[in-house]
A protein has these predicted regions:
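Beta-strand/loop nucleic-acid-binding surfaces
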Residues: 189-229
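Conserved catalytic neighborhood of penicillin-recognizing serine enzymes
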Residues: 8, 75-78, 268, 313-374, ...
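Conserved active-site-proximal loop/helix segments of enzymes involved in bacterial cell-wall
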Residues: 106, 386-390, 411-439
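Beta-lactamase-like hydrolase cores
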Residues: 11, 127-139, 157-166, 222-229, ...
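Short active-site loop at a secondary-structure junction
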Residues: 217-225, 255-260, 283-303, 315-322, ...
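A short, well-structured edge-of-sheet supersecondary motif
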Residues: 10, 167-186, 253-282, 381, ...
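Non-catalytic, structured segments within soluble enzyme domains
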Residues: 1-185, 365, 372, 376-386, ...
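Active-site SXXK
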Residues: 48, 120, 269-270, 293-321, ...
């Protein structure tokens, strides 16, 4: 994978680097952390000499050898699946422990659908960026001095490693209708920075959304047009505009402040086909699909209605959509839930109530059935492990995860048969024996 050769063909330096990887593969990445990778490799070479596996002369020669790895544009690693892979790692760690996970020689077949995973990632990114751009421009990610060669300085600015569509760039000059930019040069495996200086332009039309600054953002740029957004020395993210052949055109980007998550599941088997737990795994490994507990809000209402349909109500049953007051307890203000429209519509059928997501009907329904019954159904669907039996919970005031809620909706799509989320299809040990299989 790293050197595109068999084990017996490896040099001492190459073998030493591979031996250095298991402790912390990401810390010794040959591209992103080249200096640390070479230092760790050389330490391993030194230990090989100390323990008599190689001579001192061989050690010195091997340490001087540059770290050259085969860079692949395609291969087994899917950047879009980092959140999925990390969730699988957590489950394996919980099941087999650290020794079993890293030394057990396990072969794991997951439920991941690579095509769906790529679509999921792009869809979430598109939604987050659209929402974030509506909030306005927050300014550059950094600023550098432009005196002399800007390449080495720009190369030191940390960029997102798992958003390959984006590049870091420094603004070289700004006119009324466009900004001239210089792209971040790649670091060489042998150390140093590429001497090539790639340039491009960001036309005003590709940064027009940024002419409105976000609330609280400091306006560093002055003037009109492109100069109202960017200044020379600004370090920003850009994305290549496809289909332009006469010159390299880029569009202005910014990392969204808003977070989100997406889960795609086979509703009949519970197999998780795709998971995206955030905009960038490199920026934040926190998986918002499995680890973030959030209020489901109105997406919880179908389960209140499911409890009602199981307990004497029908789709044509009438429930009053009108003002309702709930005593919250001694010293607490009276709770008066309202519909989103802030209107009431009188007696309405259950079908209309769920179609229009009526708050007052849902609360009145939960009050009539009793919240203990709603709590029981919430647990049976796997949305909550525990839920306080208070009426606001019928409007989704409790907390759950995207994965739990997806599993609950999958149960509905599966005709009411319970669906359990699964990331792993099969696990085999080093001898090929199946030690786990998801039924």
């Amino acid at each position: 994978l790293y050197f595109d050769k068999s084990v017996h063909e490896l040099t001492i330096a190459e073998a030493a680097y591979l031996a250095a990887l298991p402790k912390a593969p990401s810390n010794y990445h040959p591209i992103r952390n080249a200096d640390a990778a070479v230092a760790r490799r050389n330490w391993v070479i030194g230990q090989m000499a100390v323990n008599g596996f190689i001579t001192q002369e061989e050690a010195e020669k091997s340490k001087a050898e540059p770290l050259r790895v085969v860079q692949r544009t395609t291969g087994p690693h899917i950047f879009a699946a980092d959140y999925f892979a990390e969730e699988v790692r957590r489950q394996l760690l919980e099941r087999y422990g650290e020794k079993g996970l890293y030394q057990g020689g396990l072969s794991v077949r997951t439920t991941l659908d690579p095509k769906l995973q790529l679509i999921a990632r792009k869809s979430l990114m598109k939604g987050l960026m659209s929402y974030d751009m509506d909030a306005g421009w927050r300014g550059p990610v950094n600023k550098i001095q432009l005196g002399g060669d800007w390449g080495p300085v720009l190369a030191e600015v940390r960029a997102l490693s798992d958003v390959p569509e984006w590049r870091l760039a420094v603004v070289l000059s700004v006119g009324d209708n466009e900004a001239q930019i210089g792209l971040q040069p790649p670091k060489l495996v042998t150390g140093g920075v590429s001497t090539e200086r790639e340039r491009g332009v960001v036309p005003l039309e590709q940064m027009k959304w940024a002419t409105r600054w976000a609330d609280g953002a400091k306006r560093g740029a002055i003037g009109r047009g492109a100069a109202a957004v960017l200044m020379p020395g600004d370090v920003v993210y850009v994305e290549k505009v496809a289909g332009v052949v006469d010159r390299p055109v880029w569009r202005l980007r910014q990392v969204p402040e808003v977070a989100g998550a997406l889960v795609a599941m086979d509703p009949h088997t519970g197999r998780v086909l795709a998971v995206t737990g955030g905009f960038s795994f490199a920026e934040s490994e926190f998986n918002r699909a499995t680890q973030a507990w959030r209020q489901p809000g109105s997406s919880f209402k179908p389960f209140v209605y499911a409890a009602a349909l199981d307990n004497g109500y029908t789709p044509s049953s009438l429930v009053l959509d009108g003002p309702i007051e709930i005593q919250a307890g001694p010293g607490q203000p009276v709770w008066k839930p309202e519909n989103y429209s802030q209107k009431f519509y009188g007696p309405s059928t259950l079908r209309v109530g769920i179609e229009q997501s009526r708050n007052t009907m849902t609360v009145r329904l939960a009050k009539d059935m009793g919240m203990p019954l709603v709590v029981e159904y919430a647990k049976r669907f796997g949305i909550y492990e525990d839920l306080a039996p208070y009426l606001p919970m019928s409007l989704g005031a409790g907390e759950t995860t995207v994965l739990r809620l997806t599993s609950a909706y999958a149960t509905i799509a599966n005709g009411g048969r319970k669906v359990t989320a699964s990331f792993i299809d099969r696990i085999q040990d080093r001898y090929g024996k199946t030690v786990f299989k998801h039924d």
